[in-house]
């Protein structure tokens, strides 16, 4: 809700939609969230989503499982070291289904298997240009 009041550009790493359409359903499907808890969660999500506006632009970085594994290894976070490949695959499938049905606003899909932002400044510049073009129609 604070984002609505902001006068400057806000960039978020995650949206409320991802938890509701990807992570929570995945936990429910894995048997790690009860049906009652999932239904309660989704009811709360619907209330929250009615109070916030969708982003001006949703940037989706589409990545293959090998790219995801590579990024996880680069980060070196201990708690991520035991993430299973089948879990990543299920999340990827849920992301793809969600993105395919996303109709709340503008969407920019970038192939993360191609881009290497931290190492390649030209890639970062290209991505920034694409974002600016979507937001402002400048390019």
Predicted region positions:
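A basic- and aromatic-enriched beta-loop-alpha substructure that forms the phosphate/nucleotide-
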Residues: 1-34
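Short secondary-structure boundary/capping segments
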Residues: 2, 8, 49-50, 99-100
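Conserved beta-strand scaffold positions in the cores of enzyme catalytic domains, especially
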Residues: 11, 58-60, 107-109
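A generic structural signal for alpha->beta connector loops
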Residues: 7-8, 55, 104-106
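A glycine- and Lys/Arg-enriched "phosphate-lid" helix/loop adjacent to the NTP-binding pocket
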Residues: 21-96
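Conserved nucleotide-binding/hydrolysis micro-motifs of P-loop NTPases
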Residues: 16-18, 63-68, 114-117
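NTP-dependent small-molecule kinase module
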Residues: 69-139
